[in-house]
Amino acid sequence: MLYLVGFLLATVCLLVLGVNVWVLIDHFLTIDVPPSIPHPVKFRILHFCFHLTTTWGHILEKMNICSMPQFFCFLQDSLSSKENHGVFVKDLRFGTIPVRLFRPKAASSKPRRGILFFHGGGAMIGSLDSHHNLCTFLARETDSVLVSVGYRKLPYYHHPSLYHDCINASIHFLKSLKAYGIDPSRVVICGESIGGAAAVVVTQTLLSRTDIPKIRAQVLIYPILQAFYFQSPSHLMHKNIPFLTKDFMITCICKYLAIDFSWKDAMLTGACISPSAWKKYEKWLSPDNIPKRFRTTYQPPESPAPFNEAAYLETKHAMNIDISPLVADDKIIAQLPEAFLVSLHWDIIRDDVLLYKKRLEDQGVPVTWHHVEDGFHGCILLFDKKLFSFPCSLNIVNAVVSYIKDL
């Protein structure tokens, strides 16, 4: 019996060691670190940890122990140290939606600015806890009342749960500003990654509402703005750069939109875009709209691949504006409030931010653009991680704070 137990333990240890060594060789040693990103060893370590977590998550998912997103979020939240220095924090519910309120402890002689915040994570990972310190920092440094929304996400919830939660929480918040001591003329909506997409969709959706205060400004931190066109320079040139690679991005999109993975290649090559849709969207998505310095080594594809009608029918909902707000009509874009856009040079979705910037500017919407040459997707969450922080992390949070304080 003891021999059997020892054999099983040895087998498990060898399995763990084998998986860890495989991830080390496959990711830590082979990754190409972009030249302008400082601390390449630190970057490799983070990349290794990210893929080690997702690999073990997939293994546990195959064993029916827990899903990959659950495992990732468990580790992410367990390792998150929550700091509340100078800020009162309280967990609440807006109906059934969990939210977290951040309010500066210092007294204020007048109503404060309000911030609605939506966290990132590709609808798979990320939580109120993972973004807690970022929200604390923003609330304290801008002297604002901030509400972070804990929307529903994978593995149990698919589109449109995320956006329904964000919209309903926003309406509840905007109707309750007086209770939180907020100036209704100074409400900012802010989001990171897919949370940035949520911020755009919420702002667009609430434009026609006359019973709630208008959003003062949008703060969009490398937002994911569309989910059907993957042929731009950054999508092709930065497809393997952490922490949002082509494979992880399309996995998140397919799972969230309940699209079968068999259509992945059709989506990535553009075969799912109908000729009529491309005729409408080309003027907004063309690489010609992107500044030349971002496409110097870009080799454009021969437009989208030959049209696949079956793929189109299975994926066409990815073009809806509640998923791809980048392609909303001009009459909607023209009504939007001013925006602060953060783009990252080494981000696969960099060009979507640049295209949205042009769309806003073409319709006369004031835009403040903050481009980070050494930035990579997700870097803002490292701003307080000391040993694992990067210059770009503090660069972004300080720029966001400066912009919000001037509103």
From Swiss-Prot:
GO cellular component: membrane
Membrane topology, as annotated: Single-pass membrane protein
Residues of this chain annotated as glycosylated in UniProt: 168
Segments carrying motif Involved in the stabilization of the negatively charged intermediate by the formation of the oxyanion hole: 119-121
Keyword entries, A-Z: Glycoprotein, Hydrolase, Membrane, Signal-anchor, Transmembrane, Transmembrane helix
Ranges in the topological domain labelled Lumenal: 26-407
E.C. code: 3.1.1.-
Record GO terms (molecular function): hydrolase activity
Residue positions of the active site: 193, 347, 377
TM spans (from-to): 5-25
Domain of life: Eukaryota
Protein name in UniProt: Arylacetamide deacetylase-like 4 family member 1
Native source species: Mus musculus (Mouse)
Gene of this entry: Aadacl4fm1
